[in-house]
Amino acid sequence: MSSTAENGDAVPGKQNEEKTYKKTASSAIKGAIQLGIGYTVGNLTSKPERDVLMQDFYVVESVFLPSEGSNLTPAHHYPDFRFKTYAPLAFRYFRELFGIKPDDYLYSICSEPLIELSNPGASGSLFFLTSDDEFIIKTVQHKEAEFLQKLLPGYYMNLNQNPRTLLPKFYGLYCMQSGGINIRIVVMNNVLPRAMRMHLTYDLKGSTYKRRASRKEREKPNPTFKDLDFLQDMHEGLYFDTETYNALMKTLQRDCRVLESFKIMDYSLLLGIHILDHSLKDKEEEPLQNAPDAKRPGMQKVLYSTAMESIQGPGKSADGIIAENPDTMGGIPAKSHKGEKLLLFMGIIDILQSYRLMKKLEHSWKALVYDGDTVSVHRPSFYADRFLKFMNSRVFKKIQALKASPSKKRCNSIAALKATSQEILSSISQEWKDEKQDLLTEGQSFSSLDEEALGSRHRPDLVPSTPSLFEAASLATTISSSSLYVGEHYPHDRTTLYSNSKGLPSSSTFTLEEGTIYLTAEPNALETQDDASVLDVYL
């Protein structure tokens, strides 16, 4: 058997190729995982709950499961194997922290066959998904499992301080031993829900050296692209409202500093993009083939498992996409440079890589041939800074609020002035109609009023309907905070136009010039309308 098959690739020469890992068929690995976890979690429920102690992080429990069964284990049709559980009490605490009950954990992993996923990475690991879409089970190398064991105390402390994180959430570490072969697996949170179709998937490191999806990967139905592909497809980045952007970058910065403190590097941001504008078309054309069965609820049950929960985001985009809506599956609302509405699903993956001697040597020889800053393998501090810079400047961007130009502001002010002027005219007209009624009730005749108001011009057929200039000016001050002036050419000495302290100019005019309102009077306008005052606004 070829070495590629041993690393997890398909065995050639078979119609329905079954993957193998370390010369063990994936079906045998899946069966052993379900049997082993079913036994160890069930056995753990009998132990009383207590606080996690330091020695609990280094406990390893082991059970032998023969194919014929035993007093403690059921019979099965797989080869005999031994199943080890690392730090069972510590991982039980982690599961409880995220609201995972033992029964739910067992039901998710053991009730239905595990779904095997393709692996776009170079590690050769196998990936399995639970039928309810909650958990990912991944095979890991010996060094990765060993590193996770050493990481557990610090990981425990970090989760206590901040359970909302984009870092992987580990729920269990196990080892299957059969025929002298050790297969180590880790149970983690699922970042990309199957119920939501991912139109684009990216694995981003912030590096450019060989960071383009291979031709083989591109031929897959759902390929995973890389950094250079993202820069080509989304050259202007992804846009968020201010609150969501700040929450996302704050979470990324905190998580990167945690990884840096553990001397972890070579991690990636797994980014799934669902285009809302395409979702209706997809539903009309074809049903979602890989959707979970009806037993699965619309949202994930595990606490802090969605992307929006992980960044502590507000759950609302600039144009009102609500992340709490079950249809969004907890995705983060965003927009593309084309204006497309998006839902983003993301998480930091592949954190079980410490900056050891082999990584230092790998970077050293690559830096001799290529630009050292573009190589993905780097010292942890530089890697974190480059990762954050790439996310902040090339991937995620903030929607800038549009500022109105001065001309638009002036137009808006003029429109408001016109509207307010109409209100003033209406109020003035109504006020004088009321006053006319009061005058009529007091017995004042139309002729005497005309005589007082118009002096020598006797117009008994007209009723004064225009307010005094000064009264109109006092009302006009509510239009704008601009200065209000009375035109100097106004004939103040013509007192014959006023009567009973409520003189009536024949007409009055507002003139607007650069934020200043001028009032002018035209006393020679003789023809006055009966039902409204002659008050014009010139702009």
Swiss-Prot record:
Record-given protein name: Phosphatidylinositol 4-phosphate 5-kinase type-1 beta
Keyword ATP-binding: yes
Residues in PIPK domain copies: 25-395
Principal place of residence: cytoplasm
Domain of life of the organism encoding this protein: Eukaryota
Subunit structure: Interacts with RAC1, AJUBA, PLD1, PLD2 and ARF1.
Keywords on record: ATP-binding, Cell membrane, Cytoplasm, Kinase, Lipid metabolism, Membrane, Nucleotide-binding, Phosphoprotein, Transferase
A Pfam family this chain is assigned to: PIP5K
Signal peptide residues on this chain, from the entry's feature table: none
Chain spans, region Disordered: 1-21
E.C. numbers: 2.7.1.68
First-tier enzyme category under EC: transferase
Positions of post-translational Phosphoserine modification: 445, 447-448
Phylogenetic lineage: Eukaryota, Metazoa, Chordata, Craniata, Vertebrata
Reaction it catalyzes: a 1,2-diacyl-sn-glycero-3-phospho-(1D-myo-inositol 4-phosphate) + ATP = a 1,2-diacyl-sn-glycero-3-phospho-(1D-myo-inositol-4,5-bisphosphate) + ADP + H(+); 1-octadecanoyl-2-(5Z,8Z,11Z,14Z)-eicosatetraenoyl-sn-glycero-3-phospho-1D-myo-inositol 4-phosphate + ATP = 1-octadecanoyl-2-(5Z,8Z,11Z,14Z)-eicosatetraenoyl-sn-glycero-3-phospho-1D-myo-inositol 4,5-bisphosphate + ADP + H(+); 1-octadecanoyl-2-(9Z)-octadecenoyl-sn-glycero-3-phospho-1D-myo-inositol 4-phosphate + ATP = 1-octadecanoyl-2-(9Z)-octadecenoyl-sn-glycero-3-phospho-1D-myo-inositol 4,5-bisphosphate + ADP + H(+); 1-octadecanoyl-2-(9Z)-octadecenoyl-sn-glycero-3-phospho-1D-myo-inositol + ATP = 1-octadecanoyl-2-(9Z)-octadecenoyl-sn-glycero-3-phospho-1D-myo-inositol 5-phosphate + ADP + H(+)
Molecular function (Gene Ontology), one example: 1-phosphatidylinositol-4-phosphate 5-kinase activity
InterPro entries linked to this entry: PInositol-4-P-4/5-kinase_C_sf, PInositol-4-P-4/5-kinase_core, PInositol-4-P-5-kinase_N, PInositol-4/5-P-5/4-kinase
Protein location: Cytoplasm, Cytosol; Cell membrane; Endomembrane system
Any Gene Ontology CC annotation: cytosol
GO BP of this protein: phosphatidylinositol biosynthetic process; phosphatidylinositol metabolic process; phosphatidylinositol phosphate biosynthetic process
Function (record text): Catalyzes the phosphorylation of phosphatidylinositol 4-phosphate (PtdIns(4)P/PI4P) to form phosphatidylinositol 4,5-bisphosphate (PtdIns(4,5)P2/PIP2), a lipid second messenger that regulates several cellular processes such as signal transduction, vesicle trafficking, actin cytoskeleton dynamics, cell adhesion, and cell motility. PtdIns(4,5)P2 can directly act as a second messenger or can be utilized as a precursor to generate other second messengers: inositol 1,4,5-trisphosphate (IP3), diacylglycerol (DAG) or phosphatidylinositol-3,4,5-trisphosphate (PtdIns(3,4,5)P3/PIP3).
UniProt organism field: Rattus norvegicus (Rat)
